[in-house]
Amino acid sequence: MPTTIRDVAEAAGVSITTVSHVLSGRGRIAEGTRRRVEQAVADLAYRPNVHAQQLVTRKSRTVAIQVAGFADHVSSSALIPRSDYFLDLLNGAAEAAAERGYAVILTPPSADAATVEEFAVDGVIVVDPRGDEPLFSDRWHHPRRMVTTGRPTMVEQVAAVVDNDHRAAAVAMLEHLAEQGYRRPALMITTTARSYTSDVLEAYAAWTAARGMPPVVVTVDEPPTENAAAEALRSLLDRDPRPDAVYASAEDLALGVLHEAQRRGLRVPEELGVCSAVDSSVLQLTSPQVTGMFLHPRDIGRAAAGALLDVLDDAAAPPRDVHVPVELFARGSTLRRG
């Protein structure tokens, strides 16, 4: 017969209620008693009844993750955008949640409060939000139950924001271009409704202003595509003087710039440098390989899940920001000087 909670209580010399409190993390339990219960659980290989725990703690031990969608309906219907970044982030979040006994469900970008409530989740992680997504509605949204990766630009407060320092990352990339001899870098971005693109734009504007350089910015509609990037590059190349480098806010934009430049016979990196604010494995499949900023998305996912579960365990935990370091991978698309 399987081990029961009564067996654990008898082995530890405590009541069933005490065992329940130790397993659920509730109540004030003396450290010695806690250790005896934990030892009995280990010795007897006891596995708590998940459904019973949920009834006692009033928690489903399930969290939802929603990757914020794009403005167009087709792209917004996809659960996960075609990107290493999002896959790695989701894997990191799922790993961290599982380590603490939580399951993760993935909701479509269009899921509203009523849809999420049907799953009785304890909390939600929203990836790259604008802040106008259905989950931010007053009917459901509660700061204690939501963590975002990237600042929601239209919402004042959530339990935690996990992000990179995109301003510092942008400066690092622009300094790299300058070190390689580029003097007229242009910025290609999507909508600034998301915090990371607005941060990159602000950093670029400040960096060019400090050097007396005119900012050259071209904006493409979401979702970022290679075709949109190719069209945007054509407009940049019509300028006089034309840019000698393009800093793209997404990997698909960088790929589109590279392919259009090569189609036009421009030598990369000699005549045009190409780099991306988001690194991806696809940037290493081109010739030359494309310089990218690695954002450590798996660490972002782990940190987001950890921050959400910390809040669920301690309702008094204050809101916090978590910054995950970045790493610049300089590759052939910008290396003029080795």
Residue ranges and their predicted role:
Residues 216, 234, 239-338:
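Flexible loop/turn connectors
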Residues 80-85, 108-112, 162-172, 188-232, ...:
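Hinge/beta->alpha junction and helix N-cap segments in small-molecule ligand-binding domains
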Residues 46-115, 123:
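Amphipathic helical "hinge" segments at domain boundaries
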Residues 15, 61, 122, 183-184, ...:
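Short acidic/polar active-site loop segments enriched in Thr and Asp
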